[in-house]
Amino acid sequence: MHYPEPISKLIDSFMKLPGIGPKTAQRLAFHVLDMKEDDVVQFAKALVDVKRELTYCSECGHITEQDPCYICQDKQRDRSVICVVEDDKDVIAMEKMREYKGLYHVLHGSISPMDGIGPEDINIPSLINRLKDEEVKELILAMNPNLEGESTAMYISRLVKPIGITVTRLAQGLSVGGDLEYADEVTLSKAIMGRTEM
């Protein structure tokens, strides 16, 4: 179907978001058309502000308004423990449980040869540099319990073992194939308390 160019561009833009197909993108585009102009301007500003005002922490890779992030700046944190997660949503899930008091390292993905994503395409090199520079005693691998997460955890474990740092994995109880961000706080808390050495 042929749409006016502004609608077509908006549909194409919405389709760049994960999980948004052509029908959903079309529905969203027409919803925007029906919105009040002030709401549309506010929505567009929020999109632009996210890109302009947020950056990634130079230490851990977590999203932040200031560098380093509030977690890396917190002197009360246990700097001898780093929890490695796949993305920012995992940090937020871990912080909600209020049990973990160490630092984080965000990979921004996982190793997935089928998708052409190798170790050099995610935040692994900066993790290794960080481990050489800091007094880290334990590295907790909190990858999602799926094939990509397991592959990433095994790869990091093999890289880190020779450095002499204890590498642990979250305890099972997280459903295989699930995402860490969707685990409830009790399950996540038990997984961190029952972590095992790799």
Curated annotation (Swiss-Prot):
This chain's function reads:
May play a role in DNA repair. It seems to be involved in an RecBC-independent recombinational process of DNA repair. It may act with RecF and RecO.
> Which family would the database say this protein is a member of?
Belongs to the RecR family.
**Record-linked PROSITE patterns:** RECR (PS01300), TOPRIM (PS50880)
Q: Which residues form the Toprim domain?
A: 80-175
Q: What is the lineage of its organism?
A: Bacteria, Bacillati, Bacillota, Bacilli, Bacillales
**Biological process GO terms, please?**
DNA recombination; DNA repair
Which organism does this sequence originate in? Staphylococcus saprophyticus subsp. saprophyticus (strain ATCC 15305 / DSM 20229 / NCIMB 8711 / NCTC 7292 / S-41)
Protein name (Swiss-Prot/TrEMBL): Recombination protein RecR
Record flagged with keyword Plastid = no
Q: Where are the zinc fingers (C4-type)?
A: 57-72
Xref: InterPro entries: DNA_Rcmb_RecR, Hlx-hairpin-Hlx_DNA-bd_motif, Rcmb_RecR, Rcmb_RecR_Znf, TOPRIM_dom, TOPRIM_RecR
The cross-references to HAMAP family, in alphabetical order and at most eight, read: RecR
Q: Name one GO molecular function term.
A: zinc ion binding
Keywords, alphabetical: DNA damage, DNA recombination, DNA repair, Metal-binding, Zinc, Zinc-finger
